[in-house]
């Protein structure tokens, strides 16, 4: 174990930590309660990293907020997360959904339909079958029972078109970027509609197969280079080069 240099409000660069690294964090730095799970508090200012991650900062209301971006790990559901799931089993009144996690989730027919459901008079398989893809939100999560999904919100429900790809769930933050900078750039450069689930699944709806292929290449490049700096601009240049190579553009204005 070795100790990283002290982190202060003036720190602007990302810092890579691995399990066991000791990090000095000023008390005036705000730490997200959900991300404090990744850091073991040794004393008032000293934390021990429990994972491989990037430590980064963002300014919110004149305060410095610490962001912990895991680089390894599986998806653990959190209430409010948007996830992209695949139906893997059907019961009389619910679907069992694989959300790319150690936990299978449940989507109740009454929630999906927005009304009461009677399995004696209605066939649940009319609505969703094994293999169907669903965008849902984690409504509740109890580790002893697993997460419950809801689709009662705008943009949620069965996916009827597009392509589905997967990345490591802990790389999702890099695909989205600060204030959605990376995601907005991907959408602008590829003209694809891109939906990123917190569980590492992504749905692409693109104008043509070539732009879809470029978008997939770019996302996979982000995944493999998530630990590096200057990534957004590098990915933008990569997409432009790929479009030129395929004759989609001659030059970039």
UniProtKB/Swiss-Prot annotation:
Keywords: Cytoplasm, Exosome, RNA-binding
Main location: cytoplasm
Gene Ontology BP terms: CUT catabolic process; exonucleolytic trimming to generate mature 3'-end of 5.8S rRNA from tricistronic rRNA transcript (SSU-rRNA, 5.8S rRNA, LSU-rRNA); poly(A)-dependent snoRNA 3'-end processing; RNA catabolic process; U4 snRNA 3'-end processing
Cell compartments where the protein resides: Cytoplasm
S1 motif domain span: 80-153
Record GO terms (molecular function): poly(A) binding
Cellular component GO terms, alphabetical: cytoplasm; exosome (RNase complex)
Gene3D superfamilies in alphabetical order: K Homology domain, type 1, Nucleic acid-binding proteins
Similarity annotation: Belongs to the RRP4 family.
Subunit and partners: Component of the archaeal exosome complex. Forms a trimer of Rrp4 and/or Csl4 subunits. The trimer associates with a hexameric ring-like arrangement composed of 3 Rrp41-Rrp42 heterodimers.
Described function: Non-catalytic component of the exosome, which is a complex involved in RNA degradation. Increases the RNA binding and the efficiency of RNA degradation. Confers strong poly(A) specificity to the exosome.
Entry-linked PANTHER family: EXOSOME COMPLEX COMPONENT RRP4, PNAS-3 RELATED
Name by which UniProt lists this protein: Exosome complex component Rrp4
Organism: Ignisphaera aggregans (strain DSM 17230 / JCM 13409 / AQ1.S1)
Origin organism lineage: Archaea, Thermoproteota, Thermoprotei, Desulfurococcales, Desulfurococcaceae
Gene name, Swiss-Prot/TrEMBL: rrp4
């Amino acid at each position: 174990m070795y100790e990283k240099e002290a982190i202060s409000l003036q720190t602007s660069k990302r810092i890579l930590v691995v399990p066991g690294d000791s990090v000095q964090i000023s008390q005036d730095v705000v730490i997200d309660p959900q991300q404090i799970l990744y850091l073991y508090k040794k004393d008032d200012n000293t934390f021990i990293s429990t994972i491989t991650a990037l430590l980064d900062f963002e300014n919110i209301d004149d305060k410095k907020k610490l962001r912990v971006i895991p680089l390894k790990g599986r998806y653990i559901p959190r209430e409010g997360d948007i996830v992209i799931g695949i139906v893997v089993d059907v019961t009389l009144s619910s679907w069992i959904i694989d959300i790319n996690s150690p936990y299978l989730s449940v989507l109740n027919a009454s929630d999906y339909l927005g009304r009461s459901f009677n399995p004696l008079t209605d066939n649940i398989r009319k609505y969703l079958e094994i293999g169907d893809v669903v965008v849902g939100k984690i409504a509740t999560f109890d580790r002893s029972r697993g997460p419950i999904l809801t689709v009662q919100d705008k943009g949620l429900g069965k996916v009827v078109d597009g392509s589905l790809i997967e990345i490591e769930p802990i790389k999702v933050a890099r695909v989205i970027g600060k204030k959605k900078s990376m995601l907005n750039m991907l959408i602008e450069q590829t003209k694809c509609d891109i939906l990123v689930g917190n569980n590492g699944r992504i749905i692409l709806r693109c104008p043509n197969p070539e732009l879809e292929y470029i978008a997939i290449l770019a996302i996979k490049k982000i995944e493999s280079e998530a630990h590096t700096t200057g990534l957004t601009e590098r990915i933008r240049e990569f997409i432009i080069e790929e479009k030129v190579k395929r004759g989609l553009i001659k030059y970039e204005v």
